[in-house]
Amino acid sequence: RLCYRTTPTTRLKRIVTELLERGCILDGVPGFYCQKDSGQWVLDIRGSGIMLPDRNLLGQIEAIQVRLDKVYNQKFYNLTSVDQYYGTQSKCCPHYVGVHEGDEVVCLTEGVMKSDLAYSFAQGSPYECGFVGLTGIPSYSQYERALEELDSIGVKRINVMVDSDYQVKEEVRKARDRYIEMGAAAGFEVAPITWAQKRKGVDDLYKHLFRNK
């Protein structure tokens, strides 16, 4: 339903060849770089997992996050080639799902996958609403961009639905408070939504509420 894909493991060279044969320009695309000795383009996969497209308001992919199969120091990494020859830095954007011009209300949370799952779980229910997912807590610069874009399409209210662990984690609480302040200062009605810590993220909450949908 979400159409996610796993990171390629065996066809990396063929993928690059097919893209070049189609006339795609890989210079400037995060994740691709050029080998100095051979001049060949390479796709830099640094860990296996699920690829999550980070989509802007127009539905265009600006970055790709990878949710790792095996978690070490972090669950996610951005597909990037910044430290390689002719490589490119990955820069995430506010991720939009189910947000359209004319919508008056959107929900704000953290994460591409969390936004996609929550929106998917709530579809067809009275709680169906578009989501904006910020890639990380805090992500103030992304939120500033989101506020400008949401204002441009007529959104009036933002439901702030960060993880319920803001009740015990100071960093998350401070970010939540700041999101509320920034949204109000930008002229939005801001509605902080709280639920029991048993369901950490809004995706967990919606999965519980709509599991029989």
Protein language model features and the residues they cover:
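Residue-level preference for alpha-helix termini and adjacent loops
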Residues: 3, 49, 204-205
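TOPRIM fold recognition
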Residues: 100-106, 113-213
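Phosphate-handling DNA/RNA-contact segment within nucleic-acid enzymes
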Residues: 11-153
